[in-house]
Amino acid sequence: MPFLDIQKRFGLNIDRWLTIQSGEQPYKMAGRCHAFEKEWIECAHGIGYTRAEKECKIEYDDFVECLLRQKTMRRAGTIRKQRDKLIKEGKYTPPPHHIGKGEPRP
């Protein structure tokens, strides 16, 4: 037990906010992946861990992708590599404002 329990003193429950986005949030703002987490929890509730691993895999994978965005970042990297390849071959010229030669803004 910490010497000064600041969370309890101020009536905060940061641990719950970080672990379950579906729980009550500060300022009543839903988390980014709230919908995916809610679907996963509703699917897995009451069926047990072993069955939930198999039956709720799609919901869990969607939730993890929303949190970590691994597929999105991989796709952005692939697009960037393709763009660089096209620039190198001379088939694509980026607009001037993308390469820092645009008009200066006030």
UniProtKB/Swiss-Prot annotation:
Region spans: Disordered: 84-106
Domain CHCH stretches: 30-74
PROSITE patterns per record: CHCH
Top-rank taxon, per record: Eukaryota
Keywords for this protein: Disulfide bond, Electron transport, Membrane, Mitochondrion, Mitochondrion inner membrane, Respiratory chain, Transport
A molecular function GO annotation: NADH dehydrogenase (ubiquinone) activity
Residues spanned by motif Cx9C motif 2: 56-66
Motif (Cx9C motif 1): 33-43
GO BP annotations listed: aerobic respiration; mitochondrial electron transport, NADH to ubiquinone; mitochondrial respiratory chain complex I assembly; proton motive force-driven mitochondrial ATP synthesis
Location, primary (coarse class): mitochondrion
Known role: Accessory subunit of the mitochondrial membrane respiratory chain NADH dehydrogenase (Complex I), that is believed not to be involved in catalysis. Complex I functions in the transfer of electrons from NADH to the respiratory chain. The immediate electron acceptor for the enzyme is believed to be ubiquinone.
Domain notes: Contains two C-X9-C motifs that are predicted to form a helix-coil-helix structure, permitting the formation of intramolecular disulfide bonds.
Quaternary context: Mammalian complex I is composed of 45 different subunits. This is a component of the iron-sulfur (IP) fragment of the enzyme.
Protein name stated in the entry: NADH dehydrogenase [ubiquinone] iron-sulfur protein 5
Organism of provenance: Homo sapiens (Human)
